[in-house]
């Protein structure tokens, strides 16, 4: 039975997502010992690169999604089921920092499909969990997904496509802001629709998704190519003054929400 990872990466005028995906793929190879397939478009591919993905799948991106005034090409994640060449697949965001082999445990959790339903923000331990809206579901996260090529997993990805195609309708129904498409919101709805508007224990990764959020900086503690130790710094405002707070983390996977920070980590 084959096992691998799949990443989606489409460049826009602000960020080189291909470079992010290449960096993440190298860490997947190193820490997880898995091959990596990249889904991208022709214009995102560099003219020269020394890294070789297991497979590159070129698709036509949907560029209608806009964020911060530029195209945010994050639609089409539902294609992961059909485009993955593996029997068991890890679907990761290109800005997910792999620092251990912990994510491999997701394949022991479920027979079909699993994702995170809770988060922890570094330096923000009291941050509340996210909901679609005040009276709707708690958000599921598409940052880390594990799935197998099963009938039920296929149904989930087919439903994800349906939600994407009717995103504004579901925004009105669940009272969240439509327009800017979010994979997290689409997954939140698709998985519950397939399950009869509930969640199954095997669908949930039983540890928090670690986020690096706003007003937080991350610095690699060494120049090693596969460094796993970082200093996390937070500017804490107290009575009109800034107090810098620090922690050190090691061998901890985390998702970098601020792409500028991820680029800085790539560039050393």
Predicted ranges, named:
Residues 1-7, 17-18, 38, 51, ...:
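A glycosyltransferase accessory/donor-loop signature
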Residues 12-21:
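A short, glycine/small-residue-rich beta-strand->loop->alpha-helix junction that serves as a flexible
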Residues 27-34:
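Short, acidic, metal-binding catalytic loop of nucleotide-sugar glycosyltransferases
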Residues 39-46, 61, 98-100, 205:
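Short, polar loop motifs at secondary-structure junctions
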Residues 45-84:
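Active-site-proximal specificity loops/subdomain of glycosyltransferases
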Residues 58, 73-124:
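GT-A fold catalytic core of metal-dependent nucleotide-sugar glycosyltransferases
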Residues 80, 144-146:
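Conserved hydrophobic/aromatic beta-strand scaffold that supports enzyme active sites
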Residues 115-127, 131, 136-139:
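Class I SAM-dependent methyltransferase SAM-binding "motif I" and its flanking Rossmann-like core
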